[in-house]
Amino acid sequence: MLLAATAALLWGCRDTDPRAPFIDGRIPPGLASRFLPPQGWAWGLLQPTGLPPARYGVSGPTGATKADILILASYSENAELWYETARALNAKGNAVWVLEPIGQGGSGRYSRLRDLGYAESLTPDVLTAKAMAEKVIHRRPLIVMASGASAPVAIQAIASGTAADGLILTSPRLRPDDLATLGKAQELQARGFGWLRADLHGGWSRRGPDDRMLGLTHDPIRGGVRLAWQTADPDLRMGSPSWSWIIAFADAVHAAAADEARVPIPVLVLEPDHTPNSARADCQRMPHCTLQPVVGARPALELEADAWRTAWLAKVAEFSARSADGFSPPPGGTRLPRGG
């Protein structure tokens, strides 16, 4: 299931190809135990499209599995940031999978500049998410949780027939950049400069800022976890996106908007109550969607202080359990078919 042979083969390319995936590395010194890998955590690579491999990780509960939760990480969210949440959801009886976008985290890169967010399309991420659900996890009930910029990827995957029982969108990004930025991106891409970083000073820096400084969380400890991992492991570093990625994301947002009415399963949107680009209109276009604001929170809900994260995590666990309870296996089938 974890494609260990592929992982080992690609690991051997690390010395010669900076685009190759990164499997496992150094734990940041002094990192609190709650941010370490959950018991039994394992890594794998998935490459269904013939493009760079996507990295994923998985951990399971100590007892019987009630449901599988597939987390689609956002831009610059390496899977390690989800260890604390994975452990909490494992304790509720869930197997937790975290899939990184191609070109992000430890996944393979399109560009030789590892800290450049580059992609010409997010369609490969849609195909990878579908393959993850159907070929790797391959069992129900399944809840998909998309973070930030992975929301349009998840919506397209579900609308195109990926078998799942619930969809959670946590602080979803469902709006493209402003028209002026998009216009400049299209002009530069047409001239062959789409690979350039949109913010010339936006490369990764060990000086930060960290997620608290960026206003993504109130928590000074959780706010430093991303920077800690990316400092310890250079392969995980990610700066600002290229012009091509900005266009690819805008295309994904427009495709998702066209698909929203075809999402057939329950959807839960969790976002701060004062989100400038709220997903409320998107939720209204999905037939079975509920939006629950997290009052006073900042966008990185999985990294928020307990005053907000506890409520967010409770909503995730409750929705996942309710969605799992709604799954009806086929006649003569089992609740959790054995994965392939």
Residue ranges and their predicted role:
Residues 289-340:
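Catalytic active-site module of serine/aspartate enzymes centered on a nucleophile-bearing elbow/loop
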Residues 72-77:
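Active-site glycine-rich loops that stabilize anionic/oxyanionic intermediates
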Residues 79, 86-111:
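Conserved alpha/beta-hydrolase
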Residues 149, 153-237:
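Alpha/beta-hydrolase-fold enzymes
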Residues 240-259:
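Active-site nucleophile elbow and catalytic-triad environment of alpha/beta-hydrolase enzymes
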Residues 115-135:
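Alpha/beta-hydrolase active-site loop
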Residues 5, 9-48, 53-61, 338-340:
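An N-terminal hydrophobic leader/cap segment in hydrolases
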Residues 263, 269-271:
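Short beta-strand/loop motif that positions the catalytic acidic residue
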